[in-house]
């Protein structure tokens, strides 16, 4: 899966759950800029952060 595909899925989850980038960043103890970079395909979350994202949204890692 490409960076853009992962970013699109992250953004889709966030919007589907009616959460802003700021809210997600606060819940994950990260910056809003990090969330933005993921969603635009400029970077991807590390493995531990991806686990936190999955727990936050209650999705399986296979979603990505």
Outline where the language-model segments fall.
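Canonical J-domain
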Residues: 2-3, 18, 38-42
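A short, Lys/Arg-rich alpha-helix, primarily the initiator
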Residues: 1-16
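Residues in the helix-turn-helix
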Residues: 23, 34, 44, 60-63
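Residue-level detection of the helix-turn-helix DNA-binding "recognition helix"
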Residues: 11, 15, 29, 40-42
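Short alpha-helical DNA-recognition segment
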Residues: 18-37, 52
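DNA major-groove recognition helix of helix-turn-helix/homeodomain DNA-binding modules
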Residues: 48-63
